[in-house]
Amino acid sequence: MPPKKKGIGGSKKEKTKKSTPEKDDGLTEKYRRSVLDVSVLKEHLALRSGVARQATAVRDELKSQVRDLEQLLSQERSDMKDITADLNRQYKSMETDLQSKADKLEASVDLLEKQLAECQVELKSERELRENTEAEKDAIISDLQSKLDSMERECEKILHGCLDSLLSHLADTRMKWEEQSTVIHQDVKDMLREFGINPLHM
């Protein structure tokens, strides 16, 4: 390495010695700036600490709210489970009741259908019996009417025969009475004449 030049080195020292006040001013400025930076950093750190505390408080509050919500959700799930169980129980009970009622109704329907079939059979039998009875009654009435007509004709014949016989008997009796009356009348006239009485003057 080439030897250092003293002249140059001496001049630098002189320059350094001469620039010491300026260097002090620079250090003062740097110190002032450093103090300012430290103050700003402290304020920034204080602000960050405040924000961190607020964030922590918010986080704790949120955690508390989350715990409350989880408890509420757990309670609601428990309530929902109880409600679901109760609804299932009610549904099964209603289903059992409805099935029982349906079975009873089905049994009632079967019984009513059986009774209806029996009633229809009885009704058919009663209708046939009534029709047969009416037919027999009509036949009896027709037979009685026929007999009555025959008896009426016979009675008319007998009546006419009796009337004819009576009229004939009356005619014969009348003739006999007239003959007897004529004889009696003549006898009376003869008796009157015997007594001298003229029958024409009476």
From Swiss-Prot:
<dbReference type="InterPro" id="IPR033585">
    <property type="entry name" value="DRC12-like"/>
</dbReference>
<comment type="subunit">
    <text>Component of the nexin-dynein regulatory complex (N-DRC).</text>
</comment>
<keyword id="KW-0206">Cytoskeleton</keyword>
<keyword id="KW-0282">Flagellum</keyword>
<feature type="region of interest" description="Disordered">
    <location>
        <begin position="1"/>
        <end position="29"/>
    </location>
</feature>
<comment type="similarity">
    <text>Belongs to the DRC12 family.</text>
</comment>
<protein>
    <recommendedName>
        <fullName>Dynein regulatory complex protein 12</fullName>
    </recommendedName>
</protein>
<dbReference type="GO" id="GO:0031514">
    <property type="term" value="C:motile cilium"/>
</dbReference>
<feature type="coiled-coil region">
    <location>
        <begin position="50"/>
        <end position="161"/>
    </location>
</feature>
<dbReference type="GO" id="GO:0005737">
    <property type="term" value="C:cytoplasm"/>
</dbReference>
<keyword id="KW-0963">Cytoplasm</keyword>
<comment type="function">
    <text>Component of the nexin-dynein regulatory complex (N-DRC), a key regulator of ciliary/flagellar motility which maintains the alignment and integrity of the distal axoneme and regulates microtubule sliding in motile axonemes.</text>
</comment>
<keyword id="KW-0966">Cell projection</keyword>
<feature type="compositionally biased region" description="Basic and acidic residues">
    <location>
        <begin position="11"/>
        <end position="29"/>
    </location>
</feature>
<keyword id="KW-0969">Cilium</keyword>
<keyword id="KW-0175">Coiled coil</keyword>
<dbReference type="GO" id="GO:0005856">
    <property type="term" value="C:cytoskeleton"/>
</dbReference>
